[in-house]
Amino acid sequence: MSSRLSGLLDRAAGKRVLCIGDVMLDRFIYGVVDRISPEAPVPVLRHSREASMPGGAANVARNLASLGLEPVLIGACGDDDAGRELLSIFDQDLSLSVRLVTAKGRPTTLKCRFVAGGHQLLRVDTENVAPVSEATEEELIGILSREAPGSAAILISDYAKGLLTDRLLKAVTKLAADLNIPLIADPKGRDFARYGAVDILKPNAFELSAAVHRSISTDEEAALALREALDTLPAKAIIVTRAARGISYIGQDGNVHHEAGRAREVFDVSGAGDTSLAALATAIAGGGTLSDAVHLAIAASGIAVGKAGTATVSAEEIKAALSVAGPVGRAGLLPMDAMIGQVERWRAAGLKIGFTNGCFDILHPGHIRVIEQARAHCDRLVVGLNSDNSVKRLKGPLRPINNEQARADVLSALSAVDGVIIFDTDTPLDAIAALNPDVLVKGGDYTRESIVGADIVEARGGEIVIVPLVAGHSTTAIIARSETGK
């Protein structure tokens, strides 16, 4: 299966896919909470940094680009600060073709999340969910008609923010049918019939439950709900995402299948549905079956939920995750060339890149402290891991205790780690020079002058962070205690 899915990713590369839907700006305000307000029983967030990125249908398009396809994003934004910020982000991202209509008098949908310690404290939404004007509909239909020919798939990403009117949905459905283009819809609300004869309808469990007025907690209940929905809808197939329970789906043959998710510690579910939608389209664009599409979506979303913010997933990450069986996977371990490309995509999205390194032979609280502190100073954290040969040269012939693959697997499973690379040199200097992180973090009694790569990072305006050691915790001490029993 893994080689088949990897082949689909390769065949889908460069294919043109249209994505139409509600475009929004996702803003994350990060800080620290260490006291309660004297004015009211609410936490006080001490602001540290902010990050903004395209969300909704725009995040679907970003995921398509990250997976190697050529997306065309079609939607609308307002003539306001949030809309201008979105357009500015798009101007810097050459992987997307953006066709946005400016809806006069209508705000750009903005979701502002306040985050501390990896947890969302509050979300503030700015939006107008009324249907867009007839003039906006006309512009969008015209764009669709011009852009659709030659596309490998069309995606509908509905967040119920007013863009996907009944008229626009009918136009999309007719266009896809006339041009024989696969049509995939991520619906919102209870009325699934309004999406017409789509090839794949992808609700989540809550949406499907509301549409059929039936609980779907178990596989049996999910099967009943899927059969009932398919019997009453013109859709050819329905896929329901069920969070930790994985995905259940039904095709035209009426058979229901259940696929377990790829277990991984969940850090943030923001945008995971967008990632799975993009993966479905990628599989279809690559000539895959419904089953292929489901398995690729599971692999992609399993990686996405292990990342903070509205995250994208690359083809290289999926291939790495597919290459190893088991619950941990290797979604974070990439060859250096692939990691350089991933870092470039993160940076193009306006994300702050952090780097730390070490042998991480036997993971202990001191390691965890450094990694968590490193992640607190950036949006995406890459960990450089000394290879087995490098550890032997530095620590002696009896080290490492755990080989590089085992150490990489453990690091990749941590929610604070977004990527892992293995370097064979004695220092990470070459890796730092190649990745150009914005933040370089080191644990221990270091000075700025003694940290390898500090000059490279500071030369491009980056930050150096030194995390104090946790007393009594080191791999050497753990090994000594195991030998003496003390």
Swiss-Prot record:
Q: Which gene encodes it?
A: hldE
Protein name (record): Bifunctional protein HldE
> According to the UniProt record, where is the region Cytidylyltransferase?
355-486
Q: Where is this region: Ribokinase?
A: 1-329
Protein's pathway: Nucleotide-sugar biosynthesis; ADP-L-glycero-beta-D-manno-heptose biosynthesis; ADP-L-glycero-beta-D-manno-heptose from D-glycero-beta-D-manno-heptose 7-phosphate: step 1/4; Nucleotide-sugar biosynthesis; ADP-L-glycero-beta-D-manno-heptose biosynthesis; ADP-L-glycero-beta-D-manno-heptose from D-glycero-beta-D-manno-heptose 7-phosphate: step 3/4
EC number(s) of the enzyme? 2.7.1.167, 2.7.7.70
Organism expressing this protein natively: Hyphomonas neptunium (strain ATCC 15444)
One annotated GO molecular function = heptose 7-phosphate kinase activity
Q: How does it assemble?
A: Homodimer.
Q: Which HAMAP family match?
A: HldE
Instruction: Name the GO terms of the biological process aspect.
Output: ADP-L-glycero-beta-D-manno-heptose biosynthetic process
The active site is formed by D274
Fetch the Pfam families from UniProt.
CTP_transf_like, PfkB
Q: Tell me, in a sentence or two, what this protein's role is.
A: Catalyzes the ADP transfer from ATP to D-glycero-beta-D-manno-heptose 1-phosphate, yielding ADP-D-glycero-beta-D-manno-heptose.
Which InterPro entries would you find in this protein's record?
A: Bifunc_HldE (IPR023030), Carboh/pur_kinase_PfkB_CS (IPR002173), Cyt_trans-like (IPR004821), PfkB_dom (IPR011611), RfaE_dom_I (IPR011913), RfaE_dom_II (IPR011914), Ribokinase-like (IPR029056), Rossmann-like_a/b/a_fold (IPR014729)
Tell me the residue numbers annotated for binding ATP.
N204, A205, F206, E207
Cited PANTHER family: BIFUNCTIONAL PROTEIN HLDE
The family this protein is said to belong to = In the N-terminal section; belongs to the carbohydrate kinase PfkB family. In the C-terminal section; belongs to the cytidylyltransferase family.
Going by the UniProt record, its keywords in alphabetical order are: ATP-binding, Carbohydrate metabolism, Kinase, Multifunctional enzyme, Nucleotide-binding, Nucleotidyltransferase, Transferase
